[in-house]
Amino acid sequence: MNRSPGEFQRYAKAFQKQLSKVQQTGGRGQVPSPRGAFAGLGGLLLLGGGALFINNALFNVDGGHRAIVYSRIHGVSSRIFNEGTHFIFPWLDTPIIYDVRAKPRNVASLTGTKDLQMVNITCRVLSRPDVVQLPTIYRTLGQDYDERVLPSIVNEVLKAVVAQFNASQLITQREKVSRLIRENLVRRASKFNILLDDVSITYMTFSPEFTNAVEAKQIAQQDAQRAAFVVDKARQEKQGMVVRAQGEAKSAELIGEAIKKSRDYVELKRLDTARDIAKILASSPNRVILDNEALLLNTVVDARIDGRGK
């Protein structure tokens, strides 16, 4: 039981004061009477007994704590003691102090999914006792109530909820899994007068075989997407070639019709080609001598064509 330093100092000062009075009475050179000696000794005993009684009759409840009292006569009292200093009957009553602040606890469990995959899952719970039910908690569970209850109910709820989902659903539907675990845990803990402020899944791992299978599936999906992209690209290139071929065919058809209607188009193309050949030869460092036939500039043919045209 906690005592304030001021109380002990007051008791010590009173004891020293009474002791100094006895010493002063004996130091005057007079022989004290037996009655006076017994009176002084009785006063010391009374003062010491009073200090001991007060020391055992008071106890403190710190912040964030609550207390109940066990009586040797009546058993566990239903009264809840709040923070502060309180009085009890020494040697008959015993204070039992509970920490009512929320405390975190991590519980790990190895369980199986609906598709028979093993998963390691860790659940973090933030729990505290129901203050109103502290006498019942002490009667049924004691002061280590969280050690007795939380590991078993958390494991049971985790196994029951995880068994409802496939391994892949634990990842894609994690919010739903967490909600079901929270609802079931809050309901189970309330039967033991334990309040849960927060429940969350902090860790989840699968077997190496399942992890490798998931990675292989992801790689296969990426390869399939890459192949689909290549096929789509080839299809687009093929369509482009068809369009170009159709354009070239249409162009050839138009050129043929133009030639049929007039030979001036052929002469224009011949002159353009001759000009291109001349530019290439002029820019070449080698000396080349060509006649009109090679340059497509046959003047005789040109004159003959001109004569026919006339």
Curated annotation (Swiss-Prot):
An annotated GO cellular component: mitochondrial inner membrane
Predominant localisation class: mitochondrion
Signal peptide extent: none
GO biological process per UniProt: mitochondrion inheritance; mitochondrion organization; mitophagy; negative regulation of proteolysis; protein folding; protein stabilization; substrate localization to autophagosome
Parts forming coiled coils: 212-253
Topology in membrane: Single-pass type II membrane protein
Locations listed in the record: Mitochondrion inner membrane
Deletion consequences: Impairs mitophagy.
Family: Belongs to the prohibitin family.
Note: Present with 2850 molecules/cell in log phase SD medium.
Function according to Swiss-Prot or TrEMBL: Prohibitin probably acts as a holdase/unfoldase for the stabilization of newly synthesized mitochondrial proteins. Involved in mitophagy; may act as an adapter for ATG8 that supports mitophagosome assembly. Negatively regulates the proteolytic processing of ATG32 via the i-AAA protease. Acts as a negative regulator of the m-AAA protease.
Protein name per UniProt: Prohibitin-2
UniProt source species: Saccharomyces cerevisiae (strain ATCC 204508 / S288c)
